[in-house]
Amino acid sequence: MSKFAWIVTFAVFSVTPAAAESAIPNLLGTWKGESESIVMGPGNAHHSAAPAAGPRLNSITFTMTIDKQDGRRFSGAFTSARGNDTIIAVISRNGSIYMVDDDGCTIGTILAPNRMELCYMRQSPEARVASCTEMTKQP
């Protein structure tokens, strides 16, 4: 292999990690989406209802406001007409989002700089919730 080919190969492998690191978009601002949820038991503050005999399907409009971001770490609020949760989160190097609030956890994916999918799970002796919401950043 020629000296030039070695230099090009080295340059490509040196730049790739830096490019991957800078791929994290600016998430600050307001995001909105409609959940697709399934709930057993009384649910949680957002999906509250009288317990049914079996699982029930539910959809809720959510707003997420991200007010702090430092690289891969961010925090803010996740709200609906029924509740408000403070959230903290981190983005993995592969673009996965790991988020927690006071009663459950969320795993998500950055789909585009202005779109993400967040899937929330809660399990307790009284209630279970599984919910996915595609969030779109508002202008």
Q: What name fits each language-model region?
A:
Residues 1-5:
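Positively charged n-region of N-terminal signal peptides that target proteins for export
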Residues 21-22, 87:
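Short, flexible, glycine/charge-rich loop motifs used to bind or transfer phosphoryl groups or to couple energy/partner
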Residues 16-20:
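Sec/Tat signal peptide C-region and signal peptidase I cleavage site
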Residues 57-103:
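Predominantly extracellular/secreted and cell-surface proteins with exposed
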Residues 30-44, 87-139:
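Beta-sheet ligand-binding and adhesion/scaffold domains
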Residues 22-75, 126-136:
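Short, solvent-exposed loop/hinge segments that bridge or flank secondary-structure elements
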Residues 6-15:
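Bacterial N-terminal signal peptides
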